[in-house]
């Protein structure tokens, strides 16, 4: 079974995503659905476990529909030895407010919450526990652990963690926005990408010279080839104030001619391009990369020594 690092302890949404990816047979070389979860105390630690060989893969959150992309994941992918995405899954996220058996809402004075979770239940807490004192947790499951060990009265956690720690729920399905979802990635050391499926995503990190028009020029490589960008986001390079790297997601696979040509052009144009992978999403997008055009077919025929077709005579 594949060793897969994830943000622990047992019972986090990340563990649930890991098990879903494994059950779907999306772990390269381990399509039997088996996985050996390896809990760690942060997302960067999960990715470092892959880099050091302590784990074969890591399952990490990349973005949620409430707060957007998760900076620790982005930064960890861009800095350090290269890693590659091989699969993804998206989970509907709703939380449980849990206490020890026999504790009621009136008894709750302190509550542990992972910062990302706290942001997604802020309105509920204001309405139902307005005077509660918030304590940080390093994950949703860690909040449940704090309740079980008597460090706090209540926690915002996952149903999986509540069951693991045998806690009682004050409320289930808690989330301020009913469409709250989180996307998770399966990441390993670089290798051959999964085969093209027709519903794929390709991602890269671009480091671009700080000159006028440089970003526009890079983005034009996608637009001129009819490639649909689904995300562009900047993060500081940490090398100096005002210097940024750009995370790009697009529809398509490196096996698509248009995507491959765009990546080659970016490699020529940018100071650095870090390929993060091409992988199946299971989602059908409106704009798929165009197939090889007539010019590409013509060029391939020349390379193969095939005669050019005679042009049609004018009428």
From Swiss-Prot:
Q: What Pfam families does the entry give?
A: ACT, PDT
Q: Does the keyword Amino-acid biosynthesis apply?
A: yes
Q: Where is the Prephenate dehydratase domain?
A: 3-189
Could you tell me the Gene Ontology terms of the biological process aspect for this record? L-phenylalanine biosynthetic process
Q: The ACT domain covers which part of the protein?
A: 203-280
Q: Which InterPro entries match?
A: ACT-like_dom_sf, ACT_dom, Chor_mutase/pphenate_deHydtase, Preph_deHydtase, Preph_deHydtase_CS
> Where does the record place the site Essential for activity?
182
Top EC class, one word = lyase
An example of a GO molecular function for this protein is: prephenate dehydratase activity
What the entry lists under Gene3D superfamilies is as follows: 3.30.70.260, Periplasmic binding protein-like II
Going by the UniProt record, its keywords in alphabetical order are: Amino-acid biosynthesis, Aromatic amino acid biosynthesis, Lyase, Phenylalanine biosynthesis
Annotated EC: 4.2.1.51
What CDD domains does the record point to?
ACT_CM-PDT, PBP2_Aa-PDT_like
A Gene Ontology term for the protein's cellular component: cytoplasm
Q: What is catalyzed by this enzyme? A: prephenate + H(+) = 3-phenylpyruvate + CO2 + H2O
Q: Does the keyword Lyase apply?
A: yes
Pathway listed for it? Answer: Amino-acid biosynthesis; L-phenylalanine biosynthesis; phenylpyruvate from prephenate: step 1/1
What binding partners and quaternary form does the record give?
A: Homodimer.
Protein name, per record: Prephenate dehydratase
